[in-house]
Regions:
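Conserved tyrosine-mediated DNA breakage-rejoining catalytic core shared by Y-recombinases
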Residues: 40-41, 98-143
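Short, basic (Lys/Arg/His-rich) helix/loop patches that form interaction surfaces
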Residues: 171, 180-221
Length: 244
């Protein structure tokens, strides 16, 4: 990867995706884990991280994205996936890709998306994240059911075949690349100042919550941070942010 000129953060993201898929394969007994490359004594994924500016959308650009419907279907699918991530408090690509019908739970008279982040689901303190199924999310899910091909019980059109293991990893990696390419095209068409990527939805929601006065403890909970210090570090890093 490094020889191909990929950045540390790109390599980190790919390694995290691979780790999540292997962890899932171990959980479903499709992989023994004997040659697991990560963990306590394995490869340190975090060592690949490089400091970058965190780009987020201003409310003006968020409104522009929400109110623009594209005739080009791949772009419209990508736009709605970005908004789904945003309304799910910046849910990551890998967590969205694995969402299935059984992640929808009825609790206390309401419906919720309930899941664990793949990034931390095997850690000791991993906890479930509960996201209320708002009207915006219900409408998006209905649109995907009506306008895209969904495989098995998946809620979103990322997985197009019942792949497992390495095939699933390669498949999702390819899908992420296409998703980000469509987002780049959207950003250019809407005249955003910088490149639109899947990460921008998470950063945008973080700034929306913070600017609305939501306590950092609550922001950390809905974003799946392991502790308050993680949330503080994340939010404080927006000091030198650029508006897309």
């Amino acid at each position: 990867m490094e020889k191909r000129g990929w950045s540390g953060n790109t390599r980190k993201h790919d390694m995290k995706t691979l780790s999540a898929i292997l962890n899932r394969a171990i959980k479903t007994k499709e992989y023994s884990g004997n040659s697991y490359p990560f963990g306590k004594d394995g490869f340190c994924i975090s060592a690949l991280e490089e400091e970058t500016r965190k780009r987020y959308l201003s409310q003006e650009y968020l409104d522009k994205l929400m109110n623009t419907v594209f005739a080009n279907k791949p772009r419209e699918v990508a736009r709605r996936l970005f908004l789904f991530s945003y309304f799910c408090y910046g849910m990551s690509f890998i967590d969205m890709a694995y969402l299935k019908r059984d992640n929808i739970k009825s609790e206390g008279g309401g419906k919720y998306l309930v899941y664990k982040r793949h990034k931390t689901e095997h850690s000791k303190n991993a906890r479930f994240i509960r996201i209320p199924l708002t009207n915006e999310l219900c409408l998006l899910l209905q649109w995907f059911r009506d306008n895209t091909l969904l495989v098995s019980d998946y809620l979103l059109p990322f997985v197009s075949k019942d792949y497992v293991g390495e095939k699933l990893y390669n498949h999702l990696r390819s899908r992420l690349g296409r998703y980000n390419e469509r987002l780049r095209e959207i950003g250019e068409e809407l005249c955003f100042q910088e490149k639109l990527t899947s990460y921008v939805s998470r950063h945008s929601m973080a700034m929306t919550l913070q600017s609305s006065g939501v306590p950092r403890e609550m922001i950390g909970q809905v974003m799946g941070h392991k502790d308050l210090s993680t949330t503080n570090t994340y939010l404080d890093s927006f000091g030198a942010v650029s508006y897309t």
